[in-house]
Amino acid sequence: MVSKLDLVGQAAPPAHLVVRGVEKRFGGVHALRGADFEVARGEVMALVGDNGAGKSTLMKILAGAYAFDSGDFYLNGRSVSIKSPNDAAALGIQIVYQDLALCENLDVAANLSLGSEPVKDGWSFLPKFMRPIDSLEMEAKAKKAIEQLQVRTLQSVRAKVGGLSGGQRQAIAIARAVGTESSVVMLDEPTAALGVAQTKQVLEMVKRLRDTNLSLIHISEPTRPYWI
């Protein structure tokens, strides 16, 4: 694989995720025509285009939500198959959708553990889905996740998500994606519904995520801020 070069002519880090020649049709509509890109660890790659350019289609293919007609994916130089959301999750590929997919009637801690709630010891005679949730461990994990992302505007992980600001909700959705042993995180227009101050906070958070050696894909329209 040919290495990329940065602005001073030094070899850039090797690609962590490589996408080659992805094609997708919806009937007579050719949504993707040989999409190619690559992103290294500790790098933010901006996927920028107008409505209808195929950004969301490509993102959903990577997340395993859409089938595709042709194309290849490589992770750490190894060819991988992505045919379902479970495949993507097993490879460490996570997505933060624009609608965030949060449960507004649950608190922050419950949202961060949704689907992987810690259970109390001593209940092994019951199926896991019937065991009581260890709320103290769930709260501790949520606090740790929020602290790692340096979300300073959130007063309590027991706050209901429905009462949070747009920037706080975005932070919770990002924390949930990052907390699943992910190596690639896709952000679907994370600043689209935010004001100037909240946009700045989210972009600063993306910077901090980059410094944790994640591969980040920032999906944006040309009119929205996406520089890091």
What feature does the model see in each segment?
Residues 2-220, 224-225:
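Glycine-rich phosphate-binding loops of nucleotide-dependent enzymes
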